[in-house]
Amino acid sequence: MSIFTPTNQIRLTNVAVVRMKKGGKRFEIACYKNKVMSWRSGAEKDLDEVLQTHSVFMNVSKGQGAKKEDLLKAFGTEDQTEICKQILSKGELQVSEKERSTQLEQMFRDIATIVADKCVNPETKRPYTVNLIERAMKDIHYSVKATKSTKQQALDVIKQLKETMQIERAHMRLRFIVPAKDGKKLKEKLKPLIKHIESENFDQELEIVCLIDPGCFREIDELIRCETKGKGTLEVLSLKDVEEGDEKFE
């Protein structure tokens, strides 16, 4: 599709329109095809690679720009780049039913892939296949949301699947080394955040290799930095812990 904008004599091609209705008005932005979903998933971070122009339209196909007073009333600002970001994140991507169906199917698959990669069966410590996760998502009638990133939705799926099957986030393996004088006190503070201690060496320094829930990593990192005043070290040994030699099962 080629769109001619008579107001500025720019011909926009390969256009994907994102639309938002706000304050009783319709606002549209012109984006490059295949870039909107990349932006929403976090894969694309350069706005200039997504937007064809940092302009807000009433109607992209007719080249009708939005009035400043309408933008101010609806969005509380005249900054068109910021408004473009809002529309890009929360607006409705205008695509054909076939295109929409294909995009949602791909997002469904991507979400299942993330869940399968990040989770295990807590009883066997074995990972699940993508196909099994897809079937489980269908069983709970999970509906993909085009405006949310696949990573965000994967977290939602994990929470919902916990109600129907044995599943949990795979553990992260860490090694941390802290000065001996901080060791005992710090270990007590870290205990509630550690799932399992694999090895512990207390000589001139305290060195511990342990498994944690990935959601606790930031808190552990902050604790070690604050309590040791930057003298402690924290190393991620593996992002997920599954039993070696085990194969994925359906």
Curated annotation (Swiss-Prot):
Supply the InterPro entries for this chain: Ribosome_mat_SBDS_CS, Ribosome_mat_SBDS_N_sf, Sdo1/SBDS, Sdo1/SBDS-like, SDO1/SBDS_C, SDO1/SBDS_central, Sdo1/SBDS_central_sf, SDO1/SBDS_N
Q: Where in the cell is it found?
A: Cytoplasm; Nucleus, Nucleolus; Nucleus, Nucleoplasm; Cytoplasm, Cytoskeleton, Spindle
GO molecular function list: ribosome binding
Q: Which UniProt keywords apply?
A: Acetylation, Cytoplasm, Cytoskeleton, Nucleus, Ribosome biogenesis
Residue numbers carrying N-acetylserine: 2
PANTHER family per record: RIBOSOME MATURATION PROTEIN SBDS
State how it assembles: Associates with the 60S ribosomal subunit.
What family is this?
Answer: Belongs to the SDO1/SBDS family.
What is known about what this protein does?
Required for the assembly of mature ribosomes and ribosome biogenesis. Together with EFL1, triggers the GTP-dependent release of eif6 from 60S pre-ribosomes in the cytoplasm, thereby activating ribosomes for translation competence by allowing 80S ribosome assembly and facilitating eif6 recycling to the nucleus, where it is required for 60S rRNA processing and nuclear export. Required for normal levels of protein synthesis. May play a role in cellular stress resistance. May play a role in cellular response to DNA damage. May play a role in cell proliferation.
Q: What is this protein called?
A: Ribosome maturation protein SBDS
Which organism is the protein's source?
Xenopus laevis
Corresponding gene? Answer: sbds
